[in-house]
């Protein structure tokens, strides 16, 4: 039997009093970056079960640098009629029937994950959340499929736009594999923890912040502070 891994059912949300600086709304054109990682029982979001999901809301410090917030994560019960590919379980080392998994339904999982994200979108003055992920369309596809199956209302994520750390890592470091990209960014990587949703989400969040912050060091023009469209003063500098 597979051992139970990290990411028991829990959620850590921001306090009502905690406000992410509004600068992040200008930085990404009204989008709030939220890292999401899913662990699944296969590649097909319509057929294969969603087993684990984790999210990390990105926030901006007063100096304009990004940092991850506390993670939100839970194990998920396979939906009725879903398929389980043994090869996927061998890869992510999840036992869907483990007695200590404390998994919850897709409906409850979406409520637990997406409600704090909606609150963060509102508190930052953003219009929508944008999913950040490593091969982000895979994660977005499973989130959207779960939303459709459950009839979940008010999904905060943009329906197709993403920030993909595969592309960003290839641009910044010449690497596309998450572990190699993280190491190239100077981040610690523990192979034994990989392929749990919470670990991969936390590491992807650190990587995304490292890339954006590094870019800020290379090009210190803080264009998001230069007016409502964020680009006006940049063109005026030419």
Predicted regions and their residues:
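Hydrophobic positions within alpha-helical membrane elements
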Residues: 42-44, 98, 140, 169, ...
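Acidic active-site catalytic centers that drive phospho-/nucleotidyl reactions
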Residues: 37-39, 139, 164, 200
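Amphipathic alpha-helical interface surfaces
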Residues: 109-113, 139-146, 161-164, 174-178
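Active-site-proximal helix-loop-helix substrate-binding element of RNase H-like nuclease domains
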Residues: 76-92, 96-99, 163-202
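Acidic, Mg2+-coordinating catalytic module of metal-dependent nucleases/exonucleases
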Residues: 130-137, 141-142, 146-147, 177-238
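Short, function-defining helix-loop hinge/capping sites that tune catalysis or transport
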Residues: 45-47, 101, 142, 147, ...
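Histidine/lysine/aspartate-rich catalytic loop segments that bind and position anionic ligands
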Residues: 147-152, 156-171
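Conserved non-catalytic scaffold segment of RNase H-like nuclease domains
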Residues: 2-5, 13-134, 238
């Amino acid at each position: 039997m597979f051992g139970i891994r990290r990411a028991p059912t829990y959620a850590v949300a921001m306090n009502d009093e905690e406000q992410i600086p509004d600068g992040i709304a200008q930085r990404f054109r009204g989008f709030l970056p939220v890292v999401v990682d899913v662990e699944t029982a296969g590649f097909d979001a319509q057929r294969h079960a969603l087993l684990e999901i984790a999210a990390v809301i990105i926030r901006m410090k007063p100096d304009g640098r990004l940092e991850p917030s506390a993670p939100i994560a839970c194990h998920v019960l396979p939906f009725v009629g879903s398929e389980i590919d043994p090869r996927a379980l061998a890869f992510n080392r999840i036992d869907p029937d483990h007695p200590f998994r404390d998994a919850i339904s897709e409906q409850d999982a979406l409520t637990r994950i997406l409600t704090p994200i909606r609150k963060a979108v509102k508190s930052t003055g953003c219009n929508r959340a944008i999913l950040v992920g490593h091969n982000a369309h895979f994660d977005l596809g499973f989130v959207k499929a779960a939303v459709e199956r459950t009839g979940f209302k008010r999904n905060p994520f943009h329906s197709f736009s993403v920030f993909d750390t595969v592309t960003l890592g290839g641009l910044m470091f010449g690497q596309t594999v998450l572990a190699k990209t993280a190491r190239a960014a100077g981040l610690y990587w523990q192979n034994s923890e990989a392929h749990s949703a919470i670990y991969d989400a936390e590491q992807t969040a650190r990587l995304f912040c490292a890339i954006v912050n590094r870019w800020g060091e290379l090009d210190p023009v803080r264009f998001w502070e230069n007016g409502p469209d964020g680009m006006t003063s940049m063109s005026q500098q030419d």
